[in-house]
Amino acid sequence: MLEEVLIKVLVLNDLYSTNILGTYAVAKHILDLHIDERLKNGDASLVTDIAHIELNGKEKYFYSFATKYCAMHQPKLFPIYDRFVGEMLRYFRKQTHFARFANADLKNYAEYRTIYDAFIQFFALNDFTYKQVDNYLWKLGKEHVQEKGKKEK
C-alpha cells in the first residue's frame, strides 16, 4: 500500500513540479491519515490534513500538492489550486466581482471550493468539469503572470 501512495506522490511531484523533497515521508503521512472514506465524501478538511506535514523537524504546508492529490482520486469533488489559478480568481474578482473573498480564503480549501464553484456559476461553466476549468484558468494564469512580468521589466 505504501508503494502505491509513494508512486502517486512521485508522479504528481514530477508532473506538476510541486518541489516536494521528502516524497517518502509525504507518502507515509498520507497513508497514516487513512484517507479513503474522506476522499469518497469530498471532505475539504482532508486537503489541509494532507498539506500539513513535519519534515526534518520543520512544519511544511504543501497545499497545492494536497489539492492535486485529492483531485487525482476524486476529480469531481476536488478542484486543484495552484498559483496561476489563484492569480486568475483574484483577477476575475477584481474585474467582475463574481465573489467576495479575501486572498487568504484561497488557501482555506473549503472556502476555495466555494469560490471556485461561484466562479463556475457566475460564468455559466456548469457543463465543464473542475479539470477543464482548471486547465483554462491555469493556462490563462500562466499567460497573465508572464505578461505582468514583461510589463515590470
Language-model segments: what does each one mean?
Residues M1-K58, P75-K153:
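An N-terminal alpha-helical hairpin/helix-loop-helix interaction module that forms a charged
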Residues F65-A71:
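Short hydrophobic alpha-helical segments that form membrane-spanning helices or hydrophobic packing faces
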